[in-house]
């Protein structure tokens, strides 16, 4: 095959994929119903609906952080609920109990089994931020850090959330 003919064949093979990195297919109805179910379970477990709040899940070199805030800064009751929730999950995670995320997501969340096994080497520190709270998760144990990153990656994906750096700041 000549070089020009080879280019035409190659372009013909690549044409269907050109631009595919630019567009994201719409979620399937099943994915949307699964997302809706997760949001409904989350509203019960977390005490605040996902549509009224924003989540950020950041990987950091020594672990990560969860930032959870109300979209409406005037919703002080919601902010109080978030603060109580993040402190509660920090306390639960510290003793190896990850029932909250399992209940919200309907599965054992990736990373949590290893985080439970390595709980003695993981620190959890919650503090208030405007309209919500942040839970900082840190460790010096590389296996624990990998588990924390797996946990946070799943959270970003399932909540359709960005990292904190890309969150909308009201």
List the predicted regions and their residue ranges:
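N-terminal secretory signal peptides that target proteins for export/translocation
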Residues: 1-4
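Bacterial N-terminal signal peptides
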Residues: 7-17
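Intrinsically disordered, low-complexity terminal tails/loops enriched in metal-binding residues
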Residues: 19-170
């Amino acid at each position: 095959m000549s070089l020009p003919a080879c280019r035409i064949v190659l372009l013909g093979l690549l044409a269907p994929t050109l631009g595919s990195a630019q567009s994201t297919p719409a979620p399937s109805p099943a994915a949307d119903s699964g997302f809706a179910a997760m949001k409904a379970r989350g509203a019960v477990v977390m005490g605040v609906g996902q549509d009224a709040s924003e989540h950020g899940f950041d990987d950091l070199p020594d672990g990560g952080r969860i930032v959870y805030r109300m979209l409406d800064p005037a919703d002080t009751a919601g902010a109080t609920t978030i603060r109580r929730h993040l402190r509660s999950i920090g306390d639960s995670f510290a003793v190896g109990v990850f029932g909250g995320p399992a209940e919200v997501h309907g599965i054992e969340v990736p990373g949590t089994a290893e985080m439970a096994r390595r709980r003695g080497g993981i620190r959890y520190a919650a503090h208030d931020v405007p309209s919500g709270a942040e839970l900082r998760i840190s460790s010096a144990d590389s296996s624990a850090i990998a588990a924390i990153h797996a946990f946070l990656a799943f959270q970003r994906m399932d909540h359709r959330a960005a990292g904190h750096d890309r969150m909308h700041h009201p």
